[in-house]
Regions:
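Alpha-helix-loop-beta-strand connector modules within alpha/beta enzyme cores
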Residues: 11-30, 34, 67-94
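Conserved anion-binding
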Residues: 1-61
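Glycine-rich phosphate-binding active-site loops on the catalytic face of alpha/beta enzymes
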Residues: 1-9, 53-69, 91-93, 102-124
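Catalytic cores of alpha/beta
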Residues: 38-49, 75-86, 92-108
Length: 124
């Protein structure tokens, strides 16, 4: 598992080597990034390094920070091809948010509000 402390301390090479080690394990790898805990430069660098090393599955947010804004989603989609798996987590509370995320090109959402969202679907 890459240590984001290395990234935050600008130990970019170490961060990249840690991703390579995990990638070589031949198990499916999803890189989980909480963009609210990284400045924009490091956030972009983490994505660039991950893409260069062949990471194809990303999760943005961990449910413990602020929700990811639509502006953030747009920026993420510009950096990462829609061919990659992109999951957004945190702050997703209703069906319209889920639909908007899927319409924008997000692959998957994570929410603890599944029951409420499913109830909205049932009432349609």
């Amino acid at each position: 598992m890459p240590n984001f402390i290395n990234l935050s301390k600008r130990n970019i090479d170490t961060f990249g080597m840690e991703i390579e080690i995990v990638k070589r394990s031949a198990i499916p790898v999803t890189l989980i990034i909480n963009n609210s805990k990284l400045d924009k430069e490091l956030f972009v660098k983490a994505i660039e390094i991950s893409l260069e090393l062949g990471i194809k599955s990303f999760q943005f947010g961990d449910g413990f920070g602020p929700p990811i804004s639509t502006l953030d989603v747009d920026e993420i989609l510009k950096m990462i091809s829609k061919k990659n798996h992109i999951k957004i987590v945190g702050g997703i509370k209703n069906l319209s948010q889920v639909i908007d995320l899927f319409d924008s090109g997000i692959s998957c959402v994570g929410t603890s509000n599944f029951s409420e969202i499913f109830e909205e679907v049932r009432n349609i």
